[in-house]
Design a protein with these regions (language model features):
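Ser/Thr-rich, low-complexity intrinsically disordered terminal regions
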Residues: 1-106
C-alpha cells in the first residue's frame, strides 16, 4: 500500500476531534466507505480523475491521517499512489489540501 501518512497531535477528546475531522471530510465531498476491510473516506469514482482516499485513526493523543489516490474506474481501480510524484498530481494536491485543513482544524 502506497500511502502518505501524517501524524497530527490533538488536545481535545477523541470524540470531539473525530467530529471535527468528519465535518471537514464531508464538507469537501468525501463519503465514508468500506475499502478492503478498512473504513475510509472516498471522493470520486475515477471517471475523470483519480479516486481520492483519506483514512483516519487514533493512537493516544495523535490523529493518524493516511491519504492516497487510485487511478481507474470504481472497483477496477489501479494500485494505490502516495501523495508525492507527478502522476495524478492534481488529485494528489487536492487530498493534501484536505489533510492540511484537517491539521488546522484539530
Amino acid at each position: 500500500m502506497a500511502r502518505t501518512i501524517i501524524r497530527v497531535p490533538f488536545t481535545a477528546g477523541v470524540d470531539n476531534t473525530y467530529n471535527v475531522v468528519v465535518s471537514v471530510l464531508q464538507s469537501n465531498g468525501y463519503k465514508e466507505i468500506s475499502y478492503n476491510g478498512e473504513t475510509v473516506w472516498k471522493k470520486g469514482v475515477g471517471l475523470l480523475t483519480a479516486m481520492q482516499y483519506i483514512k483516519i485513526e487514533f493512537e493516544e493523543n495523535s490523529l493518524i491521517v493516511s491519504g492516497w489516490v487510485q487511478a481507474g474506474l470504481g472497483s477496477k481501480g489501479g494500485s494505490e499512489m502516495a501523495l508525492n510524484g507527478v502522476v495524478a498530481a492534481v488529485p494528489k494536491k487536492s487530498v493534501m489540501k484536505v489533510i492540511e485543513e484537517i491539521k488546522r482544524s484539530v
